[in-house]
Swiss-Prot record:
Keywords: Ribosome biogenesis, RNA-binding, Transcription, Transcription antitermination, Transcription regulation. GO terms for cellular component: cytosol; transcription elongation factor complex. It holds the Pfam family NusB. PANTHER family: ANTITERMINATION NUSB DOMAIN-CONTAINING PROTEIN, N UTILIZATION SUBSTANCE PROTEIN B-RELATED. Changing Y18D: In nusB5; abolishes antitermination. Gene3D superfamilies: NusB-like. Disulfide bonds: none annotated. The N-terminal region functions as an arginine-rich RNA-binding motif (ARM). One of its GO terms (biological process) is transcription antitermination. Disruption phenotype: Inactivation of the gene causes cold-sensitive cell growth. This is Transcription antitermination protein NusB. Monomer in solution. Forms a heterodimer with the ribosomal protein S10. The rRNA transcription and antitermination complex (rrnTAC) consists of RNAP, NusA, NusB, NusE (rpsJ), NusG, SubB, ribosomal protein S4, DNA and precursor rRNA; S4 is more flexible than other subunits.
Amino acid sequence: MKPAARRRARECAVQALYSWQLSQNDIADVEYQFLAEQDVKDVDVLYFRELLAGVATNTAYLDGLMKPYLSRLLEELGQVEKAVLRIALYELSKRSDVPYKVAINEAIELAKSFGAEDSHKFVNGVLDKAAPVIRPNKK
């Protein structure tokens, strides 16, 4: 798949995870509804599905990775920032094929696109601290 299709998968995953976090619906239902309602022809759908399932299954683990580096309580984070960080931390911890810098840069771009003003700076700050611990060899 093209890098653009992966980027689109991440963008869709942020939107679907945002919905999941707010609704507390089953992730499979969120996925089904998202795919039924959105145009996903330029999306790496397999990667989108993996991100959704991976984040949903590993939420407590991913939250534990970010908590030491948050400047506020996890509960005080915006839902978009939480979704973006969870995706990046999933990629850093579970997808060694995704380069270190790609995971961070994609998260920054997602935060710029979907997050509040300056949320990309917050996301970058958290990942700059967490990533070297998750991947000490920076690969």
